[in-house]
Swiss-Prot record:
Keywords recorded for this protein, A-Z: DNA-binding, Sporulation
This protein's name: Small, acid-soluble spore protein alpha
UniProt key word Lipid metabolism: no
Listed GO biological process terms: DNA topological change; sporulation resulting in formation of a cellular spore
Organism: Paraclostridium bifermentans
Example of a GO MF term: double-stranded DNA binding
A Pfam family reported for this protein in Swiss-Prot or TrEMBL: SASP
Database matches in Gene3D superfamilies: Small, acid-soluble spore protein, alpha/beta type-like
Organism placement in taxonomy: Bacteria, Bacillati, Bacillota, Clostridia, Peptostreptococcales
TM ranges: none
Signal peptide: none
Miscellaneous comment in the UniProt entry for this protein: SASP are degraded in the first minutes of spore germination and provide amino acids for both new protein synthesis and metabolism.
Similarity section: Belongs to the alpha/beta-type SASP family.
PROSITE patterns: SASP_1, SASP_2
Length: 70
C-alpha cells in the first residue's frame, strides 16, 4: 500500500474543503488564491492558509464533539 497523506478521508468533502480554503485565504487578504500560482507565493503565505484552515477544522471538530454548534 502507498502512504499518501493527500488522500481525503471523505472524498465527498473535497468541494467544501476547497471552498473553505478560498474563504480563509480571502480572510487573510489573499483574494486570488484559487487562480494564483502557489509556487510564486511565499511559504509563509501558503503556511498561513493551511495553518488557519487546520485551526478552524480542529475548532469545528471540538465543537461537534462537545455537542455545540455555531
Amino acid at each position: 500500500t502507498t502512504n499518501n497523506n493527500n488522500t481525503k478521508a471523505v472524498p465527498e468533502a473535497k468541494a467544501a474543503l476547497k471552498q473553505m480554503k478560498l474563504e480563509i485565504a480571502n480572510e487573510l487578504g489573499i483574494s486570488n488564491y484559487d487562480t494564483a500560482d502557489k509556487g510564486n507565493m511565499t511559504a509563509r503565505q501558503n503556511g498561513y492558509v493551511g495553518g488557519y484552515m487546520t485551526k478552524k477544522l480542529v475548532e469545528m471538530a471540538e465543537q461537534q464533539m462537545s455537542g455545540q454548534q455555531r
